[in-house]
Swiss-Prot record:
It catalyses: adenosine(1518)/adenosine(1519) in 16S rRNA + 4 S-adenosyl-L-methionine = N(6)-dimethyladenosine(1518)/N(6)-dimethyladenosine(1519) in 16S rRNA + 4 S-adenosyl-L-homocysteine + 4 H(+). InterPro entries: KsgA/Erm, rRNA_Ade_diMease-like_C, rRNA_Ade_Mease_Trfase_CS, rRNA_Ade_methylase_Trfase_N, rRNA_adenine_dimethylase, SAM-dependent_MTases_sf. One of its GO terms (cellular component) is cytosol. Specifically dimethylates two adjacent adenosines (A1518 and A1519) in the loop of a conserved hairpin near the 3'-end of 16S rRNA in the 30S particle. May play a critical role in biogenesis of 30S subunits. This is Ribosomal RNA small subunit methyltransferase A. It is an enzyme of class 2 (transferase). GO terms for molecular function: 16S rRNA (adenine(1518)-N(6)/adenine(1519)-N(6))-dimethyltransferase activity; RNA binding. The lineage of its organism: Bacteria, Bacillati, Bacillota, Bacilli, Lactobacillales.
Length: 296
């Protein structure tokens, strides 16, 4: 058994774990292991995790962040897609009886069912993750469009993506992820994390972002799933205008084009405008108009 005198988030211990298990990181999974304890303290503090909280973690890796979460939280439910890491996590987290690791792809998991199976639904629920850069947007979009309510979400991601979360309409950074976040959450960048504190070092710097649930909206779409569908379609081809992207979603039959134009008229939106110019409220109005035009 490896010595557990050092935290996992230590360059020497991280390399020792990798050496012991002959672990080579998979670039295809965006694996970079965090080795800075100050960053981990900051993540836990930013999430304001207490002993009454349940925490969902995405991508525990070799357990560096998981260890810190387990020390602070009531229970941690971690989703790890790479089955090579399961025996490593069994070893590195052996001292913690409040951690459950499941070998599942978070994008395919029934999150609500897993929470009901493994966690006490009466406790506050938070999500914390060091997200792989290549799949940050799909994971966040999936979480934000899902039916699980988190008190807050604290994620480490590529700084460029973090900048998008609080972007304004009409800017290059504004996109589907911006709208998905701003529909439900307030975004706050807590810390910029240099690439040098990872093994191996990624090619870009990271940032810790806290997303906090907003009060219930007074202006809501007729159906949230339809709303997110329209948002994704609007940004499917950024260089195309809204008219062309809506045709890609609904089709180019004459009657469909007529219905799309009807919806745009109802919403008083210029068909030549690009999605990046629309606010969250305008996307809600558009979604309802598409419903009125029998397209949704």
């Amino acid at each position: 058994m490896m010595s557990r005198d050092l935290d996992i988030a230590n360059p020497a211990r991280t390399r020792a774990i990798m050496h012991t298990y002959g672990l080579q990181v998979k670039k295809s999974l965006g694996q970079n292991f965090l080795t800075d304890q100050n960053v981990l303290h900051n993540i836990v503090a930013t999430a304001d995790i207490g002993t009454n909280d349940n925490v969902i973690e995405i991508g525990p890796g070799i357990g560096a962040l998981t260890e810190y979460l387990a020390r602070a939280a009531h229970h941690v439910l971690a989703f790890e897609i790479d089955d090579r890491l399961l025996p490593i996590l069994d070893e590195t987290l052996a001292d913690y009886d409040n951690v459950t690791v499941v070998n599942q792809d978070i994008l395919k998991a029934d999150l609500a069912a897993m929470i009901s199976e493994h966690l006490d639904n009466e406790r506050p629920l938070k999500l914390v993750a060091n997200l792989p850069y290549y799949i940050t947007t799909p994971i966040l979009m999936n979480i934000l469009a899902g039916d699980v309510a988190f008190e807050n979400i604290v994620v480490m991601m590529q700084k460029e993506v973090a900048d998008r979360l609080a972007a304004e309409p009409g800017t290059k950074a504004y996109g589907a992820l911006t709208i998905a976040v701003q529909y439900r959450m307030a975004a706050e960048m807590a810390m910029v994390v240099p690439r040098t504190v990872f093994v191996p070092s990624p090619n870009v710097d990271s940032a810790i972002v806290k997303l906090t649930a907003l009060p219930l909206r007074t202006h809501v779409p007729f159906d949230e799933a339809a709303f997110f569908k329209v948002v994704k379609a609007g940004f499917a081809h950024r260089r195309k205008n809204l008219w062309n992207n809506l045709q890609s979603l609904f089709g180019k039959q004459p009657e469909t084009k007529t219905a799309i134009q009807q919806a745009l008229d109802i919403a008083t939106i210029d068909p030549k405008i690009r999605a990046e110019r629309l606010t969250v409220d305008e996307f809600i109005t558009l979604t309802d108009a598409l419903h009125q035009a029998d397209l949704l």
